[in-house]
Amino acid sequence: MTDTLFDRADIDALLAGRHPDPFACLGPHRHDDQIVVRALLPGAERVRALSPDGAELGTLACVDRAGCFAGTIAHDGGAPHYLLSIDWPDAHQVTDDAYAFGTLLDEAALARFSAGDPEAVLDCLGATPVRIDDTDGVRFAVWAPSAQRVSVVGDFNAWDGRRHPMRLRRPSGVWELFVPGIGAGERYKYELCAADGRVLPHKADPCARATEAPPRTASVVADVAALHAFAWHDDGWMHARPRHDDRYRVPWSIYEVHPESWQRIPEQMDRSATWDELAERLIPYVKGMGFTHVEFMPIAEYPFGGSWGYQPLAQFAPSARFGPVEGFARFVDRAHAAGIGVLVDWVPAHFPNDAHGLAQFDGSALYEHADPREGMHPDWNTCVFNVGRTEVSAFLVASALAWARRYHVDGIRVDAVASMLYRDYSRKEGEWVPNVYGGRENLESVAFLRRLNDTLHGDAAPAGVVTVAEESTAWPGVTAPTADGGLGFDFKWNMGWMHDTLAYLHEDPIHRRYHHDRMTFGLVYAFSERFVLPLSHDEVVHGKGSLVAKMPGDAWQRLATLRAYFGFMWAHPGKKLLFMGSEFAQWSEFAHDATPHWDLLDAPAHRGVQRLVRDLNRAYAAEPALHALDCHAAGFAWLIGDDRDNSVFAFARRDDTGRLVVAVCNFTPVPRAGYRLGLPAPGHWRELMNTDAASYGGANAGNDGAVWAEAVPAHGEAWSASLRLPPLATLWLTPA
């Protein structure tokens, strides 16, 4: 009798892990006036069906010793509700039957997913604790259209891919399953059988909200209800975030942080700080230093620490290196309470080819391009996202939305935009595929980036989310509105300014006169985009040397040059970004597995540089002339741009009410007495900043705090003053 309850072909297909529709045979099925229940439970010794009150409804006989059970159960004619009582060799389990539940995801939502709606990604995919018909469990859903079979595996089924094969929802390619009796905290992955029959390595969930801490690679069921119920206290901050044009008129001074190494815990095997520990230490530090924002290098889970986070595999999950995901929410909430914005680096260009990740996810090129001329990045040996695929584009946009919604981040810095925009980026002839018009522009990436920015600046995201592009070429309109043909970013990193100015400062002062244009060229295009001036981690690694180590001369000259450069940068048009350790002139390069050399602050010279950065930040934020027109030519005027023999530069910054700050920089170690400088207003001018002040580690040369502009024309101005320019120093002057 039992043999007739379970078809042999179904048994063989289930045991081989290749059944096309496990719900067609497993679970309860009506045959005439009987209810037949079939179960696949490899390793079970005895299986019975019980009513919810514990009464026995029937025994499921073993029809195959590999773990197939079947039997009829008593019923009252209605929909059967039963529990499975399972005797394992070393345990007893009573659970609902995963195959007694109907379809989970709404057809309309799946259609929206197939149409590329990021909201459907957030609504449908991943692991979500839910209650169905008074039964608690977890709904799993994953996109794998080319897979022959997908199973969810975890501690709850001994990682056995035969135990929980999923239901395919055609035509979306989404597989779903409700596993009763489990909840938040469960570890899981997916086991996929490719179309050609290969069983792939277990895959982490692309839409997981939480993960194990590396080097372990499982996804973790997040407590979604707890995240939704998180008690945010930042309503005032969120409502006050600058909108549209206002965000370009406010000060932005960004402290870039590698959270894994900012302050390790040496007493505990040099582990990384948790989010709560970072909140205790980093937020007061950033606040005290006068920075307006902290920007984290990528924090979406990444397997290899040496990638610094730029090869993520869980685009929705804060790295478990820093504790539970709620810890990041607490960090952001506390940062906002302190008046500090939080930006995160976000990586949509590429992903690593780790076996448990996105590469060949369902046995096909699902997230990446199939053609290696498009799908592999030659510099990083990583896979390139196929953003021209509707579902992949939606997946990435949903990730950005999730960071903005779930964690209240104030903005994202999009990594490696240049590599996305050009099909021949870092490729030789014959190694790339032209676009449909025969050109090198990646039209799919352009469309994706425009969509990303329109989404984050639209009603789908909290108001005030900012997007920043790391884009190193002259692609036009990176920060122009998408309606005008631009990409729609709020800001773009000014890589050209950074490279030119650092190259100038690397020269011996006696030779700088021959490279004078490197310091002035940035103003030729300074207002063609809205720029951030980045002194980032990329400039202090891979043998490039730290900022202070790039400067020539002895230690005093190097520190003085760096101070002068900071004075130049903070007065220059553009928002500011400085990488951790640079604010106190660390001598060594960035090392991801080592903490910055905080002990240098025992030395007065390094404390002085740190104090200077603090004071620059405070003055920059307090003086509208230095930030209100950062993105407008009306906010800048050269006073001296051609004194190459003396390596002196001077310029005026102003706001739209007429407030003025004049910066004058001397990039030689020669003090210059009686240096006449044209000024745009007469009378008393005070020294707002002198990077040679003794409190900053300088020699205290200068003008005793003030100069007088007399009616002596100079540099196109009707008034001028005679200045003493300290060596390797920058002065800021403002009308008294």
Swiss-Prot record:
GO terms for cellular component: cytosol. GO terms for biological process: glycogen biosynthetic process. It catalyses: Transfers a segment of a (1->4)-alpha-D-glucan chain to a primary hydroxy group in a similar glucan chain. Keywords: Carbohydrate metabolism, Glycogen biosynthesis, Glycogen metabolism, Glycosyltransferase, Transferase. It is an enzyme of class 2 (transferase). Pathway: Glycan biosynthesis; glycogen biosynthesis. Its EC number is 2.4.1.18. The keyword Amino-acid biosynthesis does not apply. Coiled coil: none annotated. It comes from the Bacteria. One of its GO terms (molecular function) is hydrolase activity, hydrolyzing O-glycosyl compounds. InterPro entries: A-amylase/branching_C (IPR006048), Branching_enzy (IPR037439), GlgB (IPR006407), GlgB_N (IPR054169), GlgB_N_E_set_prok (IPR044143), Glyco_hydro_13_cat_dom (IPR006047), Glyco_hydro_13_N (IPR004193), Glyco_hydro_b (IPR013780). The active site is at D415 (nucleophile), E470 (proton donor). The keyword Glycosyltransferase applies. Belongs to the glycosyl hydrolase 13 family. GlgB subfamily. Catalyzes the formation of the alpha-1,6-glucosidic linkages in glycogen by scission of a 1,4-alpha-linked oligosaccharide from growing alpha-1,4-glucan chains and the subsequent attachment of the oligosaccharide to the alpha-1,6 position. Monomer. NCBIfam families: branching_enzym (TIGR01515), PRK05402.1 (NF003811), PRK12313.1 (NF008967). This is 1,4-alpha-glucan branching enzyme GlgB. It comes from Burkholderia orbicola (strain AU 1054). The lineage of its organism: Bacteria, Pseudomonadati, Pseudomonadota, Betaproteobacteria, Burkholderiales.
